[in-house]
């Protein structure tokens, strides 16, 4: 039991020392606007997560990095705390399902991305969540529309 406890303590010390939280920007009141997290790899610190906040301290954007590029699930929120958008990234580009929501929490848009480009059928909803239209971006000439969480 003591060996397990010692292992847990040592692991937490090593992990705690290898990940660094850096407040990169603040608001006038001193509260964080952008926090980035870095881990130690090969003697240097590498970006692995970014969190952006509104002035009211509500989370605005949160996502992971791999090899300095956006990777995995990224989420964005309205200032009121409701989810605004979520989507998957791979190698810094949107890939997979993307969903955006109205500020009231109802679904607004959903569809698929491939290398930052909208592909396949996209569905659009009104503020009550009722489907209003569908667009097949594979059939729309010149539809190389690029989107990204900003």
Regions found by a protein language model. Name each.
Residues 4-13:
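Sec-dependent N-terminal signal peptides
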Residues 17-78, 82-90, 94-101, 106-114, ...:
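Periodic aromatic/glycine/histidine/acidic cluster detector
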């Amino acid at each position: 039991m003591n060996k397990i406890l010692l292992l847990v303590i040592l692991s937490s010390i090593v992990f705690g020392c290898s990940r660094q939280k850096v407040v990169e920007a603040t608001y006038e009141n001193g509260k964080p606007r952008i926090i980035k997290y870095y881990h130690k790899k090969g003697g240097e610190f590498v970006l692995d997560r970014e969190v952006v906040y509104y002035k009211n301290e509500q989370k605005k954007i949160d996502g992971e990095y791999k090899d300095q590029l956006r990777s995995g699930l990224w989420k964005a929120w309205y200032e009121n705390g409701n989810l605004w958008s979520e989507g998957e990234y791979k190698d810094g580009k949107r890939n997979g399902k993307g969903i955006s929501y109205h500020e009231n929490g109802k679904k607004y848009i959903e569809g698929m991305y491939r290398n930052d480009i909208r592909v396949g059928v996209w569905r659009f909803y009104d503020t009550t969540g009722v489907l209003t239209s569908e667009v097949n971006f594979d059939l729309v000439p010149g539809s190389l529309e690029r989107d990204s969480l900003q």
